Amino acid sequence: MTVVVGYITGKSGRSSLHLGVEAAQTLKTSMTVVTVVPKPWTTPSPARIDAEYATWADQLGSDSQREAQATLDKIAKGFEVSYHKFASRTAGEGLLDAAEELGAQVLVTGSCPHGALGQVVLGSTTDWLLHSSPIPVAISPRGYRGAKSGKLIRVTCAYSGTPESVQVVERVAALTDQLDVKMRVVTYAIRGRTMFPPRVGVHAEDSLLDAWADQLRETLAKLKADNVVGEDVELQVVTGNGWDAALDDTEWDDGELLALGTTSRRSIKTVFLGSHGAKIIRHSPVPVLVLPS
């Protein structure tokens, strides 16, 4: 088993490498850096063009390995790292092929380079992976350089209150027990833009939001009453006028990981995000682990 990290020079920065090292060290396993290069088209073309394409693909793989190795030599000296190049029609398919062939426990990707520093920014490849991967996918915030503590301290599980999300809490609880790290369960009460008709007024909206938050606290408390989580697990309800405000108002520790589950799709074990899950990811200031249903 290994942690597979997708990396290609000039794309997404080095944040995935930093998260990959933390993941591999936490899981006490090896790390494999995978570069996916475009697969040649099967349509006939002049031999010179084919040769130039093959040379370019080889160079892209070599440059990516050299750049990744230079970074990892600084942050993970003596750590077991291997490098592989896969050819595929798309980066996402190549990463899943690599994950299957290499026996990956988790697939790590970086954020899109176009977006706010310090937040998870989904690019097209990562977005596709979140709808297709049969294994957990970890995403690093843009510019992520690892926890100052150098290790995982706590896992926060985003909980929606559905039966499926209870199963996610159980899986995260088992993971935190295995890794001997703290766990927190957080659920969000978000005020919608059209929560009530404007004539009702802000005070009525506040009252409804407070009542909703109280109901969510009761739902969270049931996790302990039903022995889904232990008494030492922190339970928290966070309210906000939007997902961005709610995630900002959530207190995050150095070395924290946000874990969330997915929505079932055709009974296939793949990662498939609901609308709330996607919004949580896009506003997360800490690395995110998305678990397949």
Specify the residue positions occupied by each region the protein language model found:
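Small/aliphatic-rich secondary-structure junction motif
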Residues: 1-54, 153-206, 225-228, 232-234, ...
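Structural beta-alpha unit
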Residues: 12, 70-107, 225-258, 266
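General small-molecule cofactor/ligand-binding pocket signal
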Residues: 32-34, 82-86, 138, 184-186, ...
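A short acidic, glycine-rich active-site loop
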Residues: 51-66, 203-215
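Glycine-rich, Arg-bearing micro-motifs that act as flexible, cationic patches
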Residues: 106-128, 150, 257-283
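Short beta-strand elements of ligand-binding domains
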Residues: 108-111, 136-143, 288-292
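Intrinsically disordered, low-complexity Ser/Thr-rich linker and spacer segments
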Residues: 145-153
